[in-house]
């Protein structure tokens, strides 16, 4: 086992604080509307340019192991805030640095770190309660656009495109971000339910322009096994042909004689039919077939519920206004399922989301909710170069997370104002002893840090602005984009409550751990062995002319 260095007390904390400062100083230059970029080296290809706090934090690894421990703990603040709220990583880092910087002075002065921590916890609980009271629900598309713009570093076009996407697919809808092909951002909306399975044979195509099979007012047959014998399908095909409507078959597989017969009937124009594979695998496939059945008002034909293909009636088939089947995707538009049944199914999946333990399962369940409840919107990010594309895409993703957080828990005044107002509203928070009081005082001072940093990045005088904002009331604050004071909500400077709350809680949590650290253990640096001496060259005779 490698030898370890053990460092105690003040020296340990001082080294950790150095690491915290190095990381936080690199991250905080990105804060606010006049925040700067950070350039990240890449081992190959062009460097990455970013204004995203967590992207900067993740890149930082310090040579000094003790400093690195401090930096890694603050990195945890940024990534936890990103995971929980999707934004606010820079604010969380700035708050953590401020709490550590103030707190280490108190600890050095001999105050009890554990009581300081208890005081910090009391203050944070009181501030979070005030933030929740001040929170205002996001109701309008304009507010959603404003939240998105602020999170995307004051880029109004990004805020607007996210608000448009949410208008189209609903607040529960799936919104994905992809690389665009042009210089402008574009929004593509897929209405209805789309799943990633296309036609089983190109002979089903009836629209050569779109290279797709379009079915108007079709029936939908859902079967959970393979279909290889056409005899099994004949009763259904005869009933559908009599009704004179097209048919979409969704099964585990359609192969052999069954597929060949369907293709021949389609080519001859006897029957308009398309076959696709069922989406998903295993248990997820069954669940998705059930989703499609509820959406279209049909049933999944499965032996376990006593249904077989021979006994299928038209009442067992689903229906939709229109279905488009492409090479890789199938889209069901305006299914005939009852709204109450769809709502009940969505509620059931939401309960599963709450109980899900893995992120992957949760994501897949959320996709299913979105497909049932709304639709899918794709934001295609446009840029002139690949470097700009990456930077812009990261900002769009940040803005998307922030708007979701705003919809979830509401909004508060942005620009660091909400924390100052929470401090005023919390009034006189009392600790059980003077050391706890010091912890409370520490937090109340530290929460000025985000506003101070926004002003500093805009080239202003932080103390003057903080005093002016503290003397104001309500949503009165400072707009660093144009150096004016006014009502932050009216100026469209908003933060999601969840983002501000999560940033404060995570910063206080990790900063408390740093302040209560009394010893650090790290691998001792290896002594570089001296290079071996050059061997004797011997007599190099015979060199004379």
Swiss-Prot record:
Region (Disordered): 526-545
Name of the protein: Chaperonin GroEL
Catalytic activity: ATP + H2O + a folded polypeptide = ADP + phosphate + an unfolded polypeptide
Subcellular location: Cytoplasm
HAMAP family in the cross-refs: CH60
Species: Paracidovorax citrulli (strain AAC00-1) (Acidovorax citrulli)
Role, per record: Together with its co-chaperonin GroES, plays an essential role in assisting protein folding. The GroEL-GroES system forms a nano-cage that allows encapsulation of the non-native substrate proteins and provides a physical environment optimized to promote and accelerate protein folding.
InterPro entries (UniProt xref): Chaperonin_Cpn60_CS (IPR018370), Cpn60/GroEL (IPR001844), Cpn60/GroEL/TCP-1 (IPR002423), GroEL-like_apical_dom_sf (IPR027409), GROEL-like_equatorial_sf (IPR027413), TCP-1-like_intermed_sf (IPR027410)
Record family assignment: Belongs to the chaperonin (HSP60) family.
One Pfam family linked to the record: Cpn60_TCP1
EC number in record: 5.6.1.7
GO molecular function: ATP binding; ATP-dependent protein folding chaperone; isomerase activity; unfolded protein binding
Keywords: ATP-binding, Chaperone, Cytoplasm, Isomerase, Nucleotide-binding
Binding-site list for ATP: 30-33, 51, 87-91, 415, 479-481, 495
GO CC terms, sorted: cytoplasm
